[in-house]
Amino acid sequence: MQNTIPVSEVSRIRFFRSLIAIWLLMGASLFVQRAAAQTTPAGSTLPSETPARLQPVIDSFDYERRDVMIPMRDGVKLHTVIILPKGAKGAPILLTRTPYDATAQTSHAPSAHLAPILQGYDNATEVIVEGGYIRVVQDVRGKYGSEGDYVMNRPLHGPLNPTPVDHATDTYDTIDWLVKNIPESNGKVGILGISYDGFTPLMALVNPHPALKVAVPMNPMVDGWMGDDWFHNGAFREQNMGYIYEQEGTRDNKIKWWTSHFDDYDVYMEAGSAGELGKRHGLEQVGFWRKLLEHPSYDAWWQQQAMDKILADQPLKVPVLLVHSLWDQEDIYGAMAVYKAIKPKDTGNDKVFLVMGPWHHGQEIDDGSSLGVVKFDSDTGLYFRREILRPFLDQYLKDGAPKADVAPVMAFETGTNNWRRLGSWPSGCPPTSTSSNCTIRATPLYLNAGLKLSFESPKSGDAPFDEYVSDPAKPVPYRVRPIQPMGYDTGMTWSEWLVDDQREQSGRGDVLVYESETLRTPVKISGQPMANLVASTSGTDSDWVVKVIDVYPDEVAGQPGMGGYQLMISADIFRGRYRESLETPKALEAGKPLLYRFALPNANHVFLPGHRMMVQIQSAWFPLYDRNPQTFVPNIFWAKPEDYRKAVQRVYHAPDRASFVELPVVMAK
C-alpha cells in the first residue's frame, strides 16, 4: 500500500519551509553585517584604557623622588635614587652605595610618606625622617640600573685593578655631582651602609672628597679570607655559594641558586667537595668563583685588598663610626680589624669611634630587644639609632648641631645587659678623671682531665689527652638539622645560628666538652679570646673548631626555656694546614702533638654567678664550612671522594702540653 500525506500536513510543511527561508535570510544579513564590521577601519576599534604614560598625582607626598644617572670619570653612568623631604632646604645628604638594588631599597612600600618607603635594610629610618636628611642610594657599577662591569668587592686601582676606577673614585665622583646638583643640600655628605654597603664607606676613606664629613661602616666586609664572608682562617664558607651565583650571575640577580634537597646538609654532602658542587651548578662561569678556586690560601691577592691593611696606610681625614655586632653571623671580623688598624692614628681620640651591639648581622637597623631566645631587656637597636647614630651624624653634617654625647667606644655588655661607655677597646670599664679603675689580664682557662675546665693548670699524673674520631662522612652540623640555606626571607633563622643552643652538639661523641664548676662570682671578659690548642690527628690535615660557651643555670626564673641553655659567646674555626703559614699550606705530621694558636671573635660578656663556663672542641662545622678531607691535598676545593678519611683527634692537657683558651678577663685594680 502507497503512503499519502493529508492536505493539512502539506500546508504545515509549506509554512515551516517559509519560516526556515526567513531565518536563512536573517542569518545571511547578520553575517554580512559582521563581515562589514570586521573590515571597519582601525580608528573605530574600542580604544585602550591604559594611558601611554601614567602621570601619578603626588601633590600629597611628603617627599620628592629623583632618579638620575651620574657620570663617572670614565664615562660610565651610575643609577642613583635621590629622596628629598618636601620643602628641604640646607639639608645634609646621607649616601649609600649598594649592589642590592637602589630602587628596591627606596621603595619598601607604596606610600605617600617617607618613612614607609625607607623602612628596611640600610635605612636608619628614624635618623633619616626625623633628622630631615636627603637620602641617596646608588647602584654600584654593573648592578641593576647602573652601567659598567661588576666585580665583587672591586679592588682599588693597582695590581689587582688596572682600570682607573674603583669604589673610591666612584664615591668621589658621586659626591662631587651631588653637592653640585642638589640645590636643597648644605653641601655636606655622610656615607653609611651594612655589609657590602659597609665596605663601600671604607673605600670612600681612600682619597675622600672634601664634602665627605663622616662615614659609618656597619658590619663591613673587610677581609674575606681571615674572617668575613668567604673564609675563616682558611676554612671555606660554602653555604655562600648561592650568594655568589646569584650576585654575579646576572646584573639584576634574577637567576636563582637551585637545590634538590630540603636540608642543606644533604645538598653539600651529596656533592662532595665545594668545587664539584660549583661545577654541577655551572658556577665556573662566574668570575669571582674562579678567583676563589685559584686563591684558597692567604696570598697577595687576598692581602692586597684587605681593607684594614689598606686603611692602615692611609691618612685619617674623615671621622668614622664603626659598628660591630657581637653575634654577626656573616662579617664578624671586619669592623674590629679596621678599628685596630686605624685607631692608632686617632691621636686626639676624636676621629675613630666604635659601637658594639648584641646583634646579628645588620640588626642595629631593626628591633634589637632580643636575638633568638636571648633577651636584652631593652630595644638596643632603637637606642643605637636614636642615642648614638643620629647625634653622631648631626654633629658632622648639620650646621650648628651640638657635639654628640657619644663615648669613643659604646659597648653593650652581654650577660648584664648594659651599655658601657669606654675610652678605647679593649677596655674593661669606663675611665675616671685620672685613670681606669680596672685592667684586662690575659688569663688561661685550662682544659683538664675528666673534661674539666678551670683557671688552674693541668696536674702531673692526670690523663694527658682526650680523643674522638672525626668522620667526614658524618660531619658535625653547625646547627640542628634540617639546615636552612642562608637568607632573610620570612621563616628563615639564618641570622640566629650563633645564639643557637649548643646542647645538640655537646651530646655527640665527636665533640669534646669541657665544663667548669658553677661560678660563685662573676667573670667579665672584654676583648679577643685566644685559642691555644695542643692537638694531634692521625690524618695529615684537620680543622679545629673552638667554642667558648656560657651555660645557664638548670632553671631560670621567668624564662624556663633558658634552663641549661648553652650560649656561644665566641667561636671560630682554624684549618690546620695553615698552622705554620697562612700563605703556604703544609701537611700535618700524623700523630704529632702540635700547637694551634688563633684568635676568636671579640666578646664583651659577663659570666654570672650560678652559670658555668664551657669550651667545646670539634673538627667540622658543616655545611657552613666545607669538610676537611683530613688527608692533605693541594686544593680542598677539588678533594676527591677517596681523600675523605676518618681521623683520630687528640686534645692534650698535660703540664707540658697544656691546652687552654686565653680569656681577656677584667680585673679590678
Per-segment meaning from a language model:
Residues 120, 333-352:
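Active-site-adjacent alpha-helix of alpha/beta-hydrolase-fold enzymes
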